[in-house]
Swiss-Prot record:
The modification Phosphoserine is found at residues 248, 393, 466, 478, 508, 554, 624, 642, 684, 728, 772, 784, 856-857, 861, 865, 867, 888-889. This is Ataxin-2. It is linked to Spinocerebellar ataxia 2: Spinocerebellar ataxia is a clinically and genetically heterogeneous group of cerebellar disorders. Patients show progressive incoordination of gait and often poor coordination of hands, speech and eye movements, due to cerebellum degeneration with variable involvement of the brainstem and spinal cord. Expressed in the brain, heart, liver, skeletal muscle, pancreas and placenta. Isoform 1 is predominant in the brain and spinal cord. Isoform 4 is more abundant in the cerebellum. In the brain, broadly expressed in the amygdala, caudate nucleus, corpus callosum, hippocampus, hypothalamus, substantia nigra, subthalamic nucleus and thalamus. GO terms for cellular component: cytoplasm; cytoplasmic stress granule; cytosol; Golgi apparatus; membrane; perinuclear region of cytoplasm; ribonucleoprotein complex; trans-Golgi network. The keyword Cytoplasm applies. The modification Phosphothreonine is found at residue 741. Involved in EGFR trafficking, acting as negative regulator of endocytic EGFR internalization at the plasma membrane. Monomer. Can also form homodimers. Interacts with TARDBP; the interaction is RNA-dependent. Interacts with RBFOX1. Interacts with polyribosomes. Interacts with SH3GL2 and SH3GL3. Interacts with SH3KBP1 and CBL. Interacts with EGFR. Interacts with ATXN2L.
Amino acid sequence: MRSAAAAPRSPAVATESRRFAAARWPGWRSLQRPARRSGRGGGGAAPGPYPSAAPPPPGPGPPPSRQSSPPSASDCFGSNGNGGGAFRPGSRRLLGLGGPPRPFVVLLLPLASPGAPPAAPTRASPLGARASPPRSGVSLARPAPGCPRPACEPVYGPLTMSLKPQQQQQQQQQQQQQQQQQQQQQQQPPPAAANVRKPGGSGLLASPAAAPSPSSSSVSSSSATAPSSVVAATSGGGRPGLGRGRNSNKGLPQSTISFDGIYANMRMVHILTSVVGSKCEVQVKNGGIYEGVFKTYSPKCDLVLDAAHEKSTESSSGPKREEIMESILFKCSDFVVVQFKDMDSSYAKRDAFTDSAISAKVNGEHKEKDLEPWDAGELTANEELEALENDVSNGWDPNDMFRYNEENYGVVSTYDSSLSSYTVPLERDNSEEFLKREARANQLAEEIESSAQYKARVALENDDRSEEEKYTAVQRNSSEREGHSINTRENKYIPPGQRNREVISWGSGRQNSPRMGQPGSGSMPSRSTSHTSDFNPNSGSDQRVVNGGVPWPSPCPSPSSRPPSRYQSGPNSLPPRAATPTRPPSRPPSRPSRPPSHPSAHGSPAPVSTMPKRMSSEGPPRMSPKAQRHPRNHRVSAGRGSISSGLEFVSHNPPSEAATPPVARTSPSGGTWSSVVSGVPRLSPKTHRPRSPRQNSIGNTPSGPVLASPQAGIIPTEAVAMPIPAASPTPASPASNRAVTPSSEAKDSRLQDQRQNSPAGNKENIKPNETSPSFSKAENKGISPVVSEHRKQIDDLKKFKNDFRLQPSSTSESMDQLLNKNREGEKSRDLIKDKIEPSAKDSFIENSSSNCTSGSSKPNSPSISPSILSNTEHKRGPEVTSQGVQTSSPACKQEKDDKEEKKDAAEQVRKSTLNPNAKEFNPRSFSQPKPSTTPTSPRPQAQPSPSMVGHQQPTPVYTQPVCFAPNMMYPVPVSPGVQPLYPIPMTPMPVNQAKTYRAVPNMPQQRQDQHHQSAMMHPASAAGPPIAATPPAYSTQYVAYSPQQFPNQPLVQHVPHYQSQHPHVYSPVIQGNARMMAPPTHAQPGLVSSSATQYGAHEQTHAMYACPKLPYNKETSPSFYFAISTGSLAQQYAHPNATLHPHTPHPQPSATPTGQQQSQHGGSHPAPSPVQHHQHQAAQALHLASPQQQSAIYHAGLAPTPPSMTPASNTQSPQNSFPAAQQTVFTIHPSHVQPAYTNPPHMAHVPQAHVQSGMVPSHPTAHAPMMLMTTQPPGGPQAALAQSALQPIPVSTTAHFPYMTHPSVQAHHQQQL
């Protein structure tokens, strides 16, 4: 079929061919294949050396013998052996198609018959008007072995090839490169061909532009006039090198390939190869048209079509099966035109030739298959499909498979796993070689199976747990919400904001953990009971601090937990009286165990209550959870020694207070006992009641009164009547108390009572106190339970004294002292109560009595005094905290107050819920702690040192710091109340025993110095909680604050008072995690306690404060102690450091920083908490201490200043650091403490900073009074502090609170705090 579509070549076509020529296909040459067929006619169709790859000239030169005509196939391919290319008008090959060359829509490759006489050398119509670039998509059919398939860009449109016979054979170029690079040497054209060829030499394909053929789209060349025809491919300009074809790998390339015939024409090869696999129509000379798939071609242009059939014009339908022939070979002389339709000329250049691009399409097609809907037909397909869905057999039934295999394949299948049918069994033999190999194999197998990797892999394979169970599920125990179980907090979810504190302090969860044997229980109860505390600054913060000391427990569980350890028996036995640091001193070594046993003992609500009660009255309880615990331990140093190793010193504060906090701390984890102690109060109704208001201000347990309450609550554990004193005094200083003379013990008791009676005590006792003294709240809680359990506790303490020998000399004495304290405390409380109307009445009275007694005897017999103080303070811990400031008044005076208030306290105790808790706690604690029943919890006096400090205590304190080693970095003075319990040698010893307090190497010195200064202060003050081991509640590092600040100061009473308050204050603080334990003779620990309480975060432990020598204004001291209340602290510490501890999330830390700021700034920080008056006094005390103690407490000794603390003020800085998650508590090394205590300003500063940081919540002013233990002389910066933070503590005069320039006052202040 000839197509009129053929048109004269156009320049565009020429351009295209030029482009093909330019785009050389280097790979083609490698595809060259030897000519399979010898040329037709004269010689085989030797491919002429088609001279140039350049496009042929615009017009072909007319052959000499005839008119110019479109380029013929011979032009493109060279002569086909038919003579010189003369065209014979009449000659036809294969049904020859006579007539002038015409374009074919179908590219026909007529086979030229060799020897056909050439007609006139006229040119046949060019091979296709437009050169069709290769089409890679058409290479479906395999080319003949010798036919390469160069890749080329196909051009959509007809590709026409016409054959023109030529008489002259084109001479083969003798120089044919046989290399695969396909370099063609130009072949000299044969004589005739020379005329026929275009001057530029025709390429494989005559350049489209070179041919004047009429059609540009396709050209069909009629071979009618040509004796022979040659395939002419579209596209002109042959190019020498063979290009790289799409199917270049097809065929058998050989290194020795002679490019004959059309193979020598690069362009021709390129185009033909590119159309392999495409639909092709071949018109033969007889006019028939055959259609098929172009498969291959030979060098002589013989074509092979697959699936060929003759195309009939009549029927439009497809060919019949019988008409299709597998393949047909068309000789070059037989066909006229070959046409390839619908070629994509842009295919080659359309896409990138990258593997991904090529593989992205199937054979060049980009579109995806069209999906057709499936029709199930009329069968019951739905039912069948459903049946398949319901079929769970997973395919064949095994028996069916076995049967099928057997029937069809003769294979008998079984379930035998040995695969005997597929494997060859080992042939066992007894040869030596085989046995060796077998042994070696067994050895290797054993090694592999015993390897950790193998076991891990097997474990994974055998692990039935799901990914969720293994990695994402949160599993909690049903008892997690019960604060009393040891594992209560183990799996409890802790919000990220609270994790630091908890971890550092061995906080809530940990304190419950076995490590804090009892604390877990006591601490937990307090914690659970005051779960609110956790989240509630009032409730949670204090409770947590007191109860859990949780913050403390983790890092410094020893001190807090020490209370139990105090009891000679394990911490667990101690728990009931755990609060009482009496035993801990004896038990310093038990500190490790103290966590387990104490936690359990304290874990019980009752034990917690007992301790908290006492602490409540004492005020250290606040600190107890964190800082206070340490101070208590220190104070209890005697009993608490074991508990606190490091913290004991802190516990040292007032015997009661110290004892209680130590217990809590010991039990849980450093802070746990304190927590327990303070926590118990929380547990008790009183604890809860005061907690809400006081907790914030004091940072004690549940509420504002939490300080007192927590302590009270804790104490309740010891005895319903006077749980605090009992727990604290006896446990705190069983040994210490014994060591101390009964009179001294009594004095301690009185001091504590006084302290409790002091504003702090009032606060503790009365919620309203929240507003005024921060400790008041603590006392409030603790007093009622204290009164109720007072006698019980006393009995317990006596038993403990007899049963436990941790503090050989102080236990029995503690019992006596406790009894004395109770009496004294009642008197003192009455007095104090008069002064401080708030609920400090009962608790305060007892504390006052105790404190007075302690204070009086303390100087004479420090050992006894601490014991009494410890008992009283423990019992009165909360009260002491509240009244700690107030306790500034002389020991006797305080004693009277205590006695007076004792009655009130008894009433309160009856009302308080703490007593039951205290009882529970008592079982945990050693029975001896019960002696702390002496309700001298208020005991603001510096009696803490007598009992608490016990020689052992210092060691325990440090030990606890060791426990809280990280936290211990900053030994925070344990509640000064604790240390100041008594300036007894014990107190100094703790300081001296700073070695014991590993965390605070300098502690001993400080303590000694403080102790020396203590000369000025009451013995209690001196010995009291000089050790300020008040790491952040969460951190167990209690800074052992050498209570030695003012060992000689008359501040002894104050110290007991501090001790009492310390438990109260510290418990909260400890709970709050900010423990500013100033073992120094001040109630500074109370400060810390306060902050802790306020925050209810255990982190508050950092609220540590060194009590510089308070002016030893007994009244002022207690007040000062109160100042430590969280609120007070916050107010007290207007100091920027208060800001340092701005952790709002961590109330304790905040409390401490705030308190500190207030303390330092004196009046700068408004007292947010009701403990304001206490704060005021505390502030005074802080200021007093500030000069001497600020630097000391936050001394180089404290070198590792808690990060949160800003160096701005040594005291503050460390304290601030503790506030939140920091475990570091101010480590007030004895040396530092010494200067601190020696220099009231220094000490005051420390307490200020610490207390403020730890005591004050994130907002310094907002928090309830912090346990700002600033022991400042009446003179000193006390005024500012007292005014700002301590003002709420009217019991202790402002004068007392001023930075304690002289040690005595400072110690006393600590006690109060």
